[in-house]
Amino acid sequence: MGAHSVFLILFSVIAIAIVVHGQGQAGFISIDCGSPPNINYVDTDTGISYTWDAPFINAGVNLNVSEEYGYPKNPVLPFPLADVRSFPQGNRNCYTLTPSDGKGNLYLIRASFMYGNYDGKNALPEFDLYVNVNFWTSVKLRNASENVIKEILSFAESDTIYVCLVNKGKGTPFISALELRPMNSSIYGTEFGRNVSLVLYQRWDTGYLNGTGRYQKDTYDRIWSPYSPVSWNTTMTTGYIDIFQSGYRPPDEVIKTAASPKSDDEPLELSWTSSDPDTRFYAYLYFAELENLKRNESREIKIFWNGSPVSGAFNPSPEYSMTVSNSRAFTGKDHWISVQKTAESTRPPILNAIEIFSAQSLDEFYTRIDDVQAIESIKSTYKVNKIWTGDPCSPRLFPWEGIGCSYNTSSYQIKSLNLSSSGLHGPIAFAFRNLSLLESLDLSNNNLKGIVPEFLADLKYLKSLNLKGNNLTGFIPRSLRKRATANGLALSVDEQNICHSRSCRDGNRIMVPIVVSTLVIILIAALAIICIMRRESKIMYSGAYSGPLLPSGKRRFTYSEVSSITNNFNKVIGKGGFGIVYLGSLEDGTEIAVKMINDSSFGKSKGSSSSSSSSQVSKEFQVEAELLLTVHHRNLASFVGYCDDGRSMALIYEYMANGNLQDYLSSENAEDLSWEKRLHIAIDSAQGLEYLHHGCRPPIVHRDVKTANILLNDNLEAKIADFGLSKVFPEDDLSHVVTAVMGTPGYVDPEYYNTFKLNEKSDVYSFGIVLLELITGKRSIMKTDDGEKMNVVHYVEPFLKMGDIDGVVDPRLHGDFSSNSAWKFVEVAMSCVRDRGTNRPNTNQIVSDLKQCLAAELAREPKSNHEKKEVVKEKYTKTKSTVQNYSSNEYNSSSGSVSLSFGDYSTFGPMAR
């Protein structure tokens, strides 16, 4: 039996026999890279639970180390080092880690490498590591049995962390194990805040007796190496030392031992040399008093670097550990740290442990978020068989295969995309349109079907479009032909399948008579049906006004009928600028809501006069009635009918038992509105908006998206209502139309307000405000303690900059939510309210992102009642509410008050730069 088989059997037995004890390892990600599929086990040396790596990466091959270096010849070989994942293809291959604590938190990331001649070449490779888009370190091995360990402390800039291996032409990259550990985000501070990562240089246990300090002794699972020169003594204690006083939490076996010089008057000295004098080093020194000092004894210490003081004099505590670090980076070639006793000290200096890190700047930029979302959608839609992991454009030396980028701005942009011969199937996806800065697109030699979509003409910077070698049919859109004719676009298509207007006309001569004849027959039949239905309508409503015919299931009511079904307008269930809403009941008992339109209905446009209000009401009533007849979606309020008999106007909807979202959030009912329910409401509303933008032909922009226009039924399912201000766009063009500004203060898109240009992103802005109201429980416009008006975006800004998601979330949730889900939700909301509409996501992306938020919430464990109370108590102690819920009905907007401008929040919270 081969060595690998023996090891695998033993490996499986241990994996089955040991109960995986993940408790205490909350937030740990421990990956055995290259392990067999579906293998999960507990490492007997560390007690750490490891898992296979396929869920984290879809590239590379799994291989075992050679028999010479594996089990049983090496019986003490740690399980994670017995196999590797190797990456013979692609310049950059990335593991995708999604830590449970999400963005804004500090993590220790550790990668392990043992070559073990896994490829039989006896050739030690050299390659680089990156975290996200920034360089981490180079991996160099001295021999095949060496276990090279690399560590970095890094703040997560998003919910996803990419750890990438980069081939630099010196051998095939590989990896044995990858680990992530959540840290206390307040420790390991530097003068650069969170704008650097810290790469481990050394971590020494200077009073080492035995052990490594790893988990479970070290809650952060740091690996401590022994360091004890012959000129040092070692002291220890068995007494209690509080390691939790400080967030650094050194393990007992490390802090309870210390080094001291053999001569009491000598210092403790450490030195190292840097090959790069510009490297910035930070040292973290650990101290605790281990001796019972007498009354006439004292230990007072000062720390020096290259002769300059790092700290003032201090006395190590016998009760708890303390950590001292340099506030300014150490730079230069030669470094010398000296721990000395002061003149007043009777006892020699001590040092329990030390960590030294080099600071790695986060200099690289990320790809523009809209481009990332678009290319990820393309990747998912077509299941692109390329090594597309990590950021598409960054680091700039290693973009994705087939992608060309522009690196002239603070965010990189995709300029060219070559997917020729990539096995693409199906129609040309709408996601290509969202690569708005694209100059060259090559989709040739695939199996794309359907028409050439007109939205490709929206790519205004496109200079080259190659669609040859596909199964596309139909006309070339006029807008594309026009650009190609004007020599602004190099267009390549298959002439035999895709036709210009003249050639298609000749080819369709036979079809024209058939189509015309069919249409004539259909028209005659339709006229006959209409005549019959009109006659029946006159009988049913004898004496009533005969207006447009309503579709099946919709009714036109007379005023007397409206009065009857509302019991003479007996019960008011809502009021607003449009008029009053009454509860009604149809003959079959179905409850309905009757919205009576008054003469001051609907929002006035910017610059409108009162003299035009009556005609405006009539126009908006007509717009809403016509739209309600044509739109049908489960997340749009269902339309029953209307009344317009010359005296009164009314719109009649299905009754929504829980009223509108604005009132519900302000009521006592909101106490029971869990985070999961809020996410469902957000998704429902987003889907309704998505239907208006992308499911209707022609598209519709609502123009008055707000919590008051989102209705809730008895199951808290959300439906968008009130289409009086809606705008129908010509054909499928959602670029923009110039129109008077209408909407509600606090929700109006500032870009629309200032330019009069309306498009779908105006609705997206308003929806971003709705999302912020959902998560905060605040109104779109509120009052501060000093009586000033504040928009909800400005309310959340300071919390995001501090990375305080608890400060953002509605306290009525009592802390019972997934922080990962909440951060993602706020990220979506803030992306919706970016200054420029082009930088906001479309509703397709919003729906997708919100579903991810829901998935994260459903995956978590709910908090206990005790935990909820503690969260609320802590939150109210930290931040008393300085903003009160404020009714937007009290707010009368001037032109300036809705002309709001907010910063770009593609990155925010603790990682805002």
Curated annotation (Swiss-Prot):
Q: Which residues form the active site?
A: 704 (proton acceptor)
Where do the LRR repeat units fall? 413-434, 437-460, 461-482
Enzyme Commission number(s) from the entry: 2.7.11.1
**First-tier enzyme category under EC:** transferase
Q: Which segments does the topology annotation call Cytoplasmic? A: 531-913
Topology relative to the lipid bilayer, per the entry, is: Single-pass type I membrane protein
Regions of biased composition (Basic and acidic residues) lie at 862-877
Q: Which InterPro entries match?
A: Kinase-like_dom_sf (IPR011009), Leu-rich_rpt (IPR001611), LRR_dom_sf (IPR032675), Malectin-like_Carb-bd_dom (IPR024788), Prot_kinase_dom (IPR000719), Protein_kinase_ATP_BS (IPR017441), Ser-Thr/Tyr_kinase_cat_dom (IPR001245), Ser/Thr_kinase_AS (IPR008271)
Major location, coarse class?
Answer: membrane
Name of this chain's protein? Probable LRR receptor-like serine/threonine-protein kinase At4g29180
